[in-house]
């Protein structure tokens, strides 16, 4: 009588090789990314593991297709609707695994921050939430029509080595929006720079920075990377306080030095240290080659006028 066949899979991670059996066996790669013990009910931890294995085997599929039968599909929806299941429980195991991979890696690690928008079509969007208000064209009288999008916003920080190897998430924040009417008029009446950062949605950049450093514990190895939306003076101050680093695409040409010139004015006087060519797409979608000039200098940046007293 022959031995039963088992489908094996190999996975290499930082020089170690691990063998996992198929999802129905005793081990799976997902076991290294979750912590079933954080759930208040052991059955929730077991269901969470089974659900991840099924959805991992059908990435891009709907929940019914990934679950394959009605019993598993119903169990999946019950898990998501369970008030005892929190995002912190779901993510805690992955955060621990990210920290372990960070400690096993060497050298500088990039923490890429950005916001992702998930859009859904629902008969009752109020049960999910709203992400934004968009222009949907004009009516017969030429008036602009607007409608809100149903969905969820996720702001995350992804740890990546300088060789491009992803280590995992270090911070995640989920939210929806509730108010759009009158916000544009409100911006015309107040100076946004005078509003405390704690009262702005953009505080998520600072929250993720704190959470990431708190998880990894080695700020000197981290470089936080963000787009123009992260050009926030409070973020620069927090980065300095936490003894870490950042790379941000500048949106505002801030005052620098003694206040009689800007950052760009000061950098224009710096010699070019090198050139870097990248390929991007123009407004027509055609690929073009762009040459970037590399200049480096330590610059003293002044706070916005509305925040100089704080």
Across the structure, where does each feature detected by a protein language model lie?
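Conserved, well-structured functional cores that handle cations and Mg-NTP chemistry
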Residues: 2-310
């Amino acid at each position: 009588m022959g031995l039963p066949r088992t489908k094996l899979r190999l996975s290499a991670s930082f020089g170690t090789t691990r063998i996992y059996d198929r999802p129905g066996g005793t081990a799976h790669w997902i076991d290294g990314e979750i912590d079933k013990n954080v759930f208040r009910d052991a059955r929730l931890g077991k269901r969470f593991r089974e659900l991840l294995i099924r959805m991992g085997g059908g990435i891009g599929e709907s929940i019914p297709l990934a679950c394959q039968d009605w019993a598993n599909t119903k169990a999946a929806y019950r898990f998501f609707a369970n008030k005892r299941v929190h995002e912190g429980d779901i993510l805690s195991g992955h955060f621990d695994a990210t920290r372990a991979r960070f400690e096993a890696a060497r050298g500088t690690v990039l923490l890429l921050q950005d916001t992702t928008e998930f859009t859904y079509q629902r008969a009752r969007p109020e049960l999910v939430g709203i992400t934004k208000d968009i222009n949907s064209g004009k009516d017969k009288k030429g008036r602009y029509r607007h409608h809100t999008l149903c969905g969820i916003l996720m702001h995350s920080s992804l740890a990546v080595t300088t060789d491009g190897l992803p280590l995992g998430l270090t911070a995640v924040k989920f939210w929806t929006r509730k108010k759009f009417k009158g916000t544009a008029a409100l911006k015309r009446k107040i100076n946004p720079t005078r509003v405390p950062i704690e009262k702005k949605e953009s505080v998520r950049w600072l929250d993720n920075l704190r959470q990431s450093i708190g998880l990894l514990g080695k700020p000197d190895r981290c470089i936080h990377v963000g787009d123009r939306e992260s050009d926030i003076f409070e973020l620069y101050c927090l980065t300095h306080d936490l003894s870490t680093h950042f790379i941000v695409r500048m949106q505002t040409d801030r005052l620098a030095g003694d206040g009689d010139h800007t950052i760009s004015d000061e950098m224009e006087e710096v010699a070019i240290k090198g050139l870097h060519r990248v390929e991007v797409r123009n407004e027509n979608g055609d690929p073009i080659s762009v040459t970037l000039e590399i200049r480096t200098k330590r610059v003293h940046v002044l706070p916005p006028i509305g925040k100089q007293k704080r």
